[in-house]
Amino acid sequence: MKYEFKSFAKINHFLNILDKRKDGYHNIQSIFQLINLFDVITFEQRSDNIINLNCNIENLKQNNSILDAINIFKKEYKIKKLGLDIYLKKSIPIGGGLGGGSSNAAVTLKALTEIWKIKKNNYSLSNLALRLGSDVPFFLNGKNAWVEGRGEIITNVDLKPYWFILIFSQYSVS
């Protein structure tokens, strides 16, 4: 069976960087807004333990957020046999500062809970998300939000619709 998910990008309306934490991260304040730019990730179960990841971008590293999410999920839920064919249709620019990798990781966590019919415990899934990256809990939440702490304190907010013009450089910013 194939499962297909949209993995949305986000913009930061602003980013207020506060004090440095003992864990090496900084506390932040920001408003994150999902935008209508997304990657599409398709998952199909395999009967073996092989994970194949294919992408429309040739140089996508085999060490990426989707595989990181799979590995952390397998360890957390003690899944021995997890074979998947994954196809990532990348539309969010890599290194564009729009959270594409974090969004892909969050979607992967959601997909795996659905594919393996794991009863979701939002607290444990959020902890997994935070281990993958500071933006991942926001994408797991899936709503526009006021974000604080390292990124794990999330308060949903209603935002008016906006039009944005995004300009992408050849240089990576994340």
Q: What is each model feature region?
A:
Residues G96-S124, F138, G142:
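DPxDG-like acidic metal-binding loop motif
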Residues L53, I86-L88, V147:
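Generic preference for hydrophobic
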Residues L18, D48, E58, S91-P93, ...:
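Residue-level signature for short turns and capping positions that connect secondary-structure elements
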Residues S65-I72, N104-V107, A111, L128:
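Generic beta-strand or strand-like secondary-structure segments
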Residues L84-G96:
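Short pre-catalytic strand/loop immediately N-terminal to key active-site residues, enriched for Gly-Thr
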Residues K2-Q33, I118-S174:
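ATP-dependent small-molecule kinase catalytic core of the GHMP/sugar-kinase superfamily
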Residues K75-D85, A111-L130:
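Phosphate-handling active-site elements
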